[in-house]
UniProtKB/Swiss-Prot annotation:
This is Transcriptional regulator MraZ. InterPro entries: MraZ, MraZ_C, MraZ_dom, MraZ_N, MraZ_sf, SpoVT-AbrB_dom, SpoVT-AbrB_sf. The gene is mraZ. The lineage of its organism: Bacteria, Pseudomonadati, Thermodesulfobacteriota, Desulfuromonadia, Desulfuromonadales. GO terms for molecular function: DNA-binding transcription factor activity; transcription cis-regulatory region binding. It holds the Pfam family MraZ.
């Protein structure tokens, strides 16, 4: 059985149709079944990524259902010692927008309009493996995130000893 903390990898270009449907990469669907014995997953707003100044990139994060249930349990049990204001913000921005999903037989999933709007998903998008989750970005946003990451990479690699 694969390591449940390191199952999603790679970058996969895709598109979204006029009805808001996209195909989850086959590798990701297979990983859900192999590692979690469950095809269900949860889609929510990703943590915004700073692009410098007051600009932020918005995307979506997708978690296996069992991993999401653990995240939600820990957040609501306040294991992080959050203030009530922080916990309310986490609920509004991360927990409450979450939607349980299941791909159809063709691997398609409907991204809810509110999440599509949040992430600016219109046509071209990227699925990006992030070990225990995967993210969904519009092509333009992902290009900006990559540009920012390239600028930060030398310092980030040095910080972890490379």
């Amino acid at each position: 059985m694969p390591d449940k903390d390191a199952i999603f990898g790679g970058e996969h270009p895709s598109t979204i149709d006029s009805k808001g449907r996209t195909c989850i990469p086959a590798r990701f669907r297979e990983a859900l079944v192999q590692a979690f014995a469950d095809e269900r997953f949860v889609m929510t707003k990703a943590r915004p990524i700073s692009l410098g100044g007051e600009r932020y990139a918005r995307g979506l994060s997708v978690y296996p259902l069992s991993a999401w249930n653990d995240i939600k349990r820990r957040a609501l049990a306040n294991e992080g010692g959050y203030t009530s204001t922080q916990l309310d913000s986490i609920k509004r921005q991360f927990l409450n927008p979450a939607v349980e999903c299941l791909a159809d037989k063709l691997g398609r999933v409907l991204i809810p309009p509110s999440l599509r709007s949040h992430a600016g998903l219109e046509r071209e998008l990227w699925f990006v493996g992030m070990d225990g989750r995967f993210d969904i970005w519009s092509r333009d946003t992902y290009d900006r995130v990559n540009d920012q990451d390239e600028q930060n990479l030398p310092a980030d690699l040095t910080a972890i000893g490379f």
